[in-house]
Amino acid sequence: RKKISTDTLEKIIYAISNASTYDEIRDIIKNAKIYESQKVILIKVLRANSLSDDARHTLAKKLVEAEENRFGKKIERTDIVTRIGPTLGLMGTLIPMGPGLAALGVGDVNTLASAIIVAFDTTVVGVGSGAVAYFVSKVRRRWYEEYLSDLDALVDTVLDKLKN
């Protein structure tokens, strides 16, 4: 992941705003130090210069929404692990406890001990996987929000330039 600094974003916005031709804007976008996927979306918006302002704005909005949906699907995976991991850990705790308690009833302490070991191991794995997935989701969500914020600013700049 590469981080786009505010200074870099500002330079790109000024360059697009001060560009005088379609080709100049396209070259600025192609040479910008931004993600390739952002360049693709910006070029699509730029190519829509023959559309009305409203149609171009609608297209840009749909392109950004599609990008948001793409990132949402990626985050869903780790969000699912965040919730399922601890649930499976709890199930792994409760399931071996039944035979362990039954073994305790007949005086078999060794079976109880091994059941408790399995129960606690699965609890730790479940909670651990949930914690790792939660951390990954939070970091990814922040990255994607920055990406989309940058994309939104750049799309607005291109739309504004095409309007003038």
Label every PLM stretch briefly.
Residues R1-T8:
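Hydrophobic membrane-targeting segments
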Residues L9-G85, R141-N164:
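Predominantly long cytosolic amphipathic alpha-helical stalk/bundle segments
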Residues K74-G128:
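Helix-termination/interfacial motifs at the ends of transmembrane alpha-helices
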Residues T111-N164:
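Channel- or pocket-lining gating/hinge segments that regulate access to a cavity or pore
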